[in-house]
Amino acid sequence: MDEAFGDSLSTDYRWLGHSHFDSHPSAGDSIYFDSLDEDADPSRTARIDRIAELLDGLNDEQISELVNGVNSTTIKENTKKEISNPNDSTRLPLEQIPGSNNLFLDPRHQLGDNSQNAQRHHEPSFNSEKASYTSTPYKNVAPKVIDSPSARHMHSNSPSFPPSQSHTSSYDQSPKGQLRDNISVPNQQDGLDPEVFNQQSKETKKSLQVPPSRNVPPPVTRPNQYNPEPNFSLSSGYPQQHFSQPELQNRNVHLETVPESYPVPPSGYPLTSSTCVSSISQPIQSTDCQKAQENLSNNKQMSSNDQDIDPFKQAITDLPPSFVNIVLEMNATIQSLSNQCQQRDKQIENITKQLLMNQQDYCPTTMSTTVSTPLCPPKRFPKSTKDFKEQKPDTKQVRSATISNDFNLKGNGRYNEKSQIAVPSEIRVQLSTLDAILLQFEHLRKELTQARKEIQILRHTSQNGDQESNESSKNAITTKTTDKGNNKENTMLNDGSTAPAKNDIRNVINTNNLDAKLSDESELMIEKNKSYSTPASSTIPTFHTSQPLTSLNMPDSRFNLAKEKQLYYRLGLQHIDQQCSVETANMLKTVLVQLNIPFAIFPSTIGQVRRQLQQGRRLYQWARNIHYLIYEENMRDGLVSKQCLADMLKKIRELKKRSL
């Protein structure tokens, strides 16, 4: 076994941190995504110089974040389609894209020599696409894939990917590290000129830059709020990783609202992968949203002083108008519900006060009965009584009871039939004890009725038995009287002795019959109890009787054996007696399985097994003797091997030939 796997163990270098599959061209170890012909591009070198300057101003933590982001979402673009369409108008140069100060990094220049080995086994190799990257403070780098009409058609027809609407935020490489929104760039096919749109986007970015205020806290943002579907990368089937966001607490995050001059794309505008929108980007606005945004802009101008007092209002107005409308509607509904709850609480308090006053004044002793039956309320005092308004409930004796919200007081002074009263704890305890007593009475009543039925049955049976006994006694008496002679009767009458009365005879017979029936019933009850106490026939074990062991019928009886008591302890039979029946049964099952003997024939075959064991012991002793005679040395202890027996047989044949 070790020799068979020795080669694989010796050539497996993965234990040393290096894989022997790295040299294979299909192992994904290449990080050069672009062709080498593009290295001489002057715009490319300018971008590399700009990236180097930006990287010099970053900290070690920011550089590690960028490296982790690139390692997690590496994607490339179809280079063949790019070569076939070099003059594609949808590809904008870096200087024309809004927010061009973002980092579009090349993995070859971003990663050093030390990080190449770490990236080999984490990233698959793609031979048809090129990707550029944007850094974010969320540690979630979304690729900005350059689109083409064929690529958009390919992604629109792909059934395995959701609509490619990325929600990632670009990171401004300023000292404060502010968060900005990348305004989505529409395609030229939608009727907007890229140059005009870029000019408008530059103007809007200048107008939207707001200086950071120290008093205003960063608003709470929810990533992917308007995209319920998960974000999937376009070239790989793996979803993007969402890491924690600890840096947002130490940075001033500013949200930019879209002004009225911002060109709204048409309703059928397809969202491509090149539109890098922030995690709280503005959705496509309708006419209602524009009206709400105008109202918000007016409210901003009117409530400038209020924002200095309450900093959270500014954060709410910076949110999208649809979200602001939802928040305002929720606030209005919450306020209305709170007002309704307050009014309902006041009504409940008034009703409870009136109810407690009436119950305490009119029937304080029957509180439990009135509360337990809310459908039959007590009578109220007439409205003309003066004590009705003056008296108040005693808080020490009666606790405040709460009534359900459906309880309404009618004008005629009566309760609503559907009203339900929450009973105080003391009254609940009393009711629970009363219920327990009632249940006990009910149980006793059932037992009493059952006993009465049994008594009636016994009476009926006793009456039937009395009738039968009376008839039999009558027949016996008549037969006896007929057998006697008339002379005896005459002598008895003449002597003046009176015959026993018939009623006395019947009473004696009835008592005897009752005693006999009671004895029969007692015997039946005893038999029933025995049947219940004795186990079922299926659970009773079958007892096997065998002949006792003696010195004559024991195995190897030709030898002088010890006494039965010594044999008992020599064989360890006391351990079997100490075991329970389950353990003994398991041992017997194991023996039957090892010997391959059914239980039905086990008593008859146990002698045969004994003889086979005895014969095997004799043959073993004979083999040991032959071995000593041939080789003049003792055989090793244990089972005799086939090879040893064959050698012994061969040696015996040789000796026989020599003797002949």
Curated annotation (Swiss-Prot):
Signal peptide annotation: none
Biological process annotations from GO: cell division; negative regulation of cytokinesis; negative regulation of septation initiation signaling; septation initiation signaling
Compartment(s) where it occurs, according to its Swiss-Prot or TrEMBL record: Cytoplasm, Cytoskeleton, Microtubule organizing center, Spindle pole body
Transmembrane segments: none
UniProt GO cellular component terms: cytoplasm; meiotic spindle pole; mitotic spindle pole body; outer plaque of mitotic spindle pole body
Comp. bias intervals (Basic and acidic residues): 384-396
Coiled coil: none
Subunit structure and binding partners: Homodimer. Interacts with cdc11, sad1, plo1 and dma1.
Keywords of this entry: Cell cycle, Cell division, Cytoplasm, Cytoskeleton, Mitosis
Protein name per UniProt: Septation initiation protein sid4
Role of this protein: Required for activation of the spg1 GTPase signaling cascade which leads to the initiation of septation and the subsequent termination of mitosis. May act as a scaffold at the spindle pole body to which other components of the spg1 signaling cascade attach.
